[in-house]
A protein has these predicted regions:
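Left-handed beta-helix
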Residues: 3, 10-184
């Protein structure tokens, strides 16, 4: 869970001899001290390599998530023959409103994206992104190539590009993220 990993990240951050890499330092230390479960990823047909991404850095984590929104991702979450099971809260389906608005800037849609249950895209635009459960994208906002965790709220006229937004964050109206390196 998040808290468990966070505590181990903090512990690792204080170690002088650590490279601060998940695969090299953090996961092995967790395995030594805790009961851990794993799933062996194997190529079903035996024709090639199994899917694997080292997500030990933010850039690698971002890239692995962006792989999932491809038309034919290497790790296909929709492959019935190789289901990936996860806990999912019982929430209403995602909702897209104001897509037929007379105002062309008020779109209410998501393209090439994964939108989780409980999300509402209310007059905003989402492109090539992943929206975690109960995210809310308000009117005239634009989210592109980004990962938004649970319960993120994006205010009206906000713009987000190539960002990872932690759960529960509220992006104020008119905020711009990912467009100006100095401001970010």
């Amino acid at each position: 869970k998040s808290r468990f990993l966070f505590e181990h990240l903090l512990e690792d951050a204080n170690l002088q001899d650590s490279t601060h890499d998940f695969g090299r330092d953090i996961i092995p230390s967790i395995i030594r001290a805790h009961r851990v479960f794993a799933f062996t990823f194997q190529d079903r047909e035996g024709n090639g390599d199994a899917y694997w991404r080292d997500v030990g850095t933010l850039d690698a984590y971002y890239a692995a998530n962006m792989d999932l929104v491809a038309v034919q991702p290497e790790l296909n979450l929709y492959d019935d023959a190789w289901p990936i099971r996860t806990y999912e809260r019982v929430l209403p389906p995602p909702k897209f409103v104001f897509s037929g608005s007379d105002d062309p800037a008020r779109k209410g849609h998501a393209l090439d994206s994964i939108v989780c249950s409980g999300c509402i895209v209310s007059g905003g635009e989402v492109l090539g992104s992943i929206l975690g459960p109960c995210a809310r994208i308000n009117s005239y906002s634009h989210v592109e190539s980004s990962i938004l965790f649970d319960n993120v709220r994006v205010g009206r006229h906000a713009k987000i590009r190539k960002a990872i937004i932690e759960k529960g964050v509220q992006i104020p109206e008119g905020m711009s993220i990912g467009y100006d390196l100095v401001e970010d």
